[in-house]
């Protein structure tokens, strides 16, 4: 019999030739300095989404350990069967209060939250419009829903308005998808203008705020809070796995929406509930976030330091209406960005060399943490300065 997997080796060879293959290995605890590779070597970590350093916070870890001791390691079932725990309801109430919504629903991941919510809200009778730079799971969710799906150029509100004017009247429902903070560039969606269009054309808006959650707005409530925006059309999505240092994703919105998703979002219905440890860790992280402003202040200081340093080096920095912890430096091709990443590692800095198909063009993606020191940023800037001289 012919091997049905004989296509895999050529496919993997193609990944290597295109410089798309990746498999980094970390040792030890998450922190500003981590051990990378085999044999492990210490590098300043500019790849992490643990923006506030809460994944290694003593009180967050203690909460997770205590939850395991009290409730065990797993939820042991889907939440509509045997997997519902008091911790889940407690976490969802805390998220809703934090986000200023009537209710919230916790999923096993941010991707599951997006895929399940989009498929529950729209189908082949409906219209979905999304920013071209949206996270991959928003795009995948739109396609899996079988709705008619159009992308508009990045942050181009005029193009979005034209799509709504041309197509909206032909469909039952309309859902607009956008990141709050775009994950690869760190820029921010023009949410006020998008929400105005949504209200004018009777459209729902799902804002994926994975990278604004915990970082922007009062008490880290996110991009919408930072911009002072609210609307009955909004569906707020965020993660527990980035600034909150745990695992999972959530949807926050009106009570009717959340009740509907509990009975129609397949990625929630058919998944085991979030583990007690993850739920407890997220709750503890939320408490730290809202009671200890020093974490966000430290992150803001490092963002400001790096932004000024990059400008002094003449690096192209995107306009930043809000202080997000993501910076990108374009590269001409995958081979070059891999070389840059290797040279930065030799200088003691671990920076993500991001290539297609994750992004349309290669770039260095720099992310900051609250526990980075001024010296860490200075070392990165010195390494980038040396790199630019050689280019």
Swiss-Prot record:
It comes from the Bacteria. Pyridoxal 5'-phosphate binds at residues 183, 208-211, 239-242. InterPro entries: Aminotrans_II_pyridoxalP_BS (IPR001917), Aminotransferase_I/II_large (IPR004839), AON_synthase_class-II (IPR050087), AONS_Archaea/Proteobacteria (IPR004723), PyrdxlP-dep_Trfase (IPR015424), PyrdxlP-dep_Trfase_major (IPR015421), PyrdxlP-dep_Trfase_small (IPR015422). Substrate binds at residues 22, 135, 358. It is an enzyme of class 2 (transferase). Catalyzes the decarboxylative condensation of pimeloyl-[acyl-carrier protein] and L-alanine to produce 8-amino-7-oxononanoate (AON), [acyl-carrier protein], and carbon dioxide. This is Putative 8-amino-7-oxononanoate synthase. It comes from Thermosynechococcus vestitus (strain NIES-2133 / IAM M-273 / BP-1). The gene is bioF.
